[in-house]
Amino acid sequence: MNSEKRLSRIYKENRSGTGKEESTMQVTKTVEETRKQIKAWKKEGKTVGLVPTMGFLHEGHASLIKKCREQNDIVVVSDFVNPTQFGPTEDLEAYPRDFERDSKLCESLGADLIFCPEPSEMYHDPHAFVSIDTLSETLCGKTRPIHFKGVCTVVTKLFHIVAPDRAYFGQKDAQQLAIIRKMVSDLNFDIEIVGCPIIREEDGLAKSSRNTYLSPEERKAALCLSKAVKAGQEAIHAGIPAEELLGKMRAVIEAEPLAKIDYVSMVDALTMQPVEKADRSVLVAMAVYIGKTRLIDNFSYEV
C-alpha cells in the first residue's frame, strides 16, 4: 500500500474517533491570533502540545500528532517551511507543499489548531538567530553549516508563540532532537521534549517528505539506507568496533550504484562527538544521496 493510500486510511479511521461531534480545528496565520487562542485555552487550565512540522505530512508526522493527542488537552501543529534552515543550493523552492492535504490529516487526527504563517510573519530583516555550538558541528552540521541555526531559531520562536507544555519530534532527525533538548535545557524552557520512534515504509525505508523526489528506480535504491541500518545493528550487538561496523554499513551503501555517501558515523548520543566503540549510549547515523535527493537514517544503542 503506498503512502497516499495509507494517509487516506488514517483519515478515514480517525475522522470519527477524535471524540468531537464536529470539527473545531482552527487555522491561524499570525502570531497574534495564535497567541490569543492559546492564552484562552490556557486560561481554562488546558495543557498544550506542539508538533512542529514543515508540512507535506506523512505517517511519521501522524504518529507525532497521535502521541500529542494522547498526552495533551490541546494539539497545535505548525505547518511552516522554514527558509532559514535551507542553504543557498538546497531545495527550499522545490520542497513539497500541500496545505489542504495537511489540514485534512490534522483534522482527522484531532488537532485543535494549525499555525501556518508566511515567512514574513516569522522573520523581519534583520533578525536574531539562536545557535547551539558543538552538537551542531558534526553529522548533518558538517555539510549543512547553517541548518541547525535555522532550526533552533524557528523552534525557539514557535516555543515563544505557542508556549507548549510538551513538544514532539521524530527520532529520524536524531541530531536535531539532541540539539533541541540541549537548547531547552540551556535556555530554561519549561517544556517537555518528547522523542518519537522512526516510522518506516513496509520495506524499511524511513518516512520522509523528500521521498516524493525519488523516481521508481531511486526509490528501490534508497533501501540501501535501511539495509545499512540492519547491518550496523547486527554488528553493534556482536561487539564489533566502530571502524569495522561503519565499514560494513558503507559497503552496503556503496554496493548501490545510485547512492553517494555524505557521512556514516557513530557518535556519543549526548555530545554528538565521534566515538571508537559503543561503551556508552551512541547514535549511529548516516546521510546518503540517492541521485540528487539527500536522505538520512539512524539507530541508537543504549548502554
Task: Mark where each language-model region is.
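Nucleotidyltransferase catalytic core that binds NTPs
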Residues: 22-258, 267-271, 299
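Phosphate/ribose-recognition catalytic cores of enzymes acting on nucleotide-derived substrates
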Residues: 248-303
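Short, Lys/Arg-enriched N-terminal segments with co-localized hydrophobic residues
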Residues: 10-24
